[in-house]
Amino acid sequence: MEHASTREIYSVQATVRTYESGADGLMKPETVLHWFQEIAEAHASCLGFGYDFVTSRSLAWVEVRLDASVNRLPRWKETVELRTWMAQETPLLARRNLEIRDAQGNCIVAASCLWAVIDIRRRRPVPLNRHISFFPDTPCKETVAPVSMDISGLLPSIREWTAERRDTDFNRHINNAAYLVWALDSLPDSWLENHQLTGIHLHFRKETHAGDSMKSLLFLRDSLTSHHLMHGDELRAEAVLEWKTAEIA
């Protein structure tokens, strides 16, 4: 990734690699989340409160929710621009907006997410201004609205698995991108082959660790799928995915 930034808007040029692409030649949906995590940390470091800053104070940035709109996913070998900007939203939350733009400047993926800083020992959020004296004054309103799905009257399909060590990140819990992978893995191949992902809505509620037994409750209604990602009876994360019928090549 090639970086170019101001303190207000941080931008990166990046090219989609082979291992970031699926069988259809498009970027894997979870790679979008990995890219967003990478540029978010780079921008936070540029502003003076990135990974090194928070870990030196026994703190960590954690993502609370993410809402993304997908016009299309970048193609293998396509070079795109990632853009991000942020601002404090509440005493405990910062909002970060992100975009992926193609070579013509078209926004092909947009996202709006909320982040908190937690005390690593207590695993509890702390007021942002306790440790961070400066936030950009860049306007950072919600650009992608959350989407909910009425699951009343629907019976779920259930899938079970064990959270794996390879999905653990620096914060010693399962990385947020894994929840999207789990949600997608719960869908039948026939659905994935005939539908195109147009929206990703993730609400992260509790940490998950390697070795945790997990299950997915999948609900389908029209162009939405709802995924309750559970550990026993405890909801760890909820995903609502938006779809449209795939175009015939």
What are these regions (language model features)?
Residues 2-12, 67-150, 208-210, 219-249:
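HotDog/MaoC-like acyl-thioester-processing domains
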Residues 58-73, 195-207:
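Small beta-barrel nucleic-acid-binding modules, principally OB-folds
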Residues 78-79, 155-157, 212-213:
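Short coil-to-beta-strand transition motifs
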Residues 2-63, 110-112, 118-198:
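Hot-dog-fold acyl-thioester-processing enzymes
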Residues 161-245:
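Acidic/His-leaning functional-site neighborhoods
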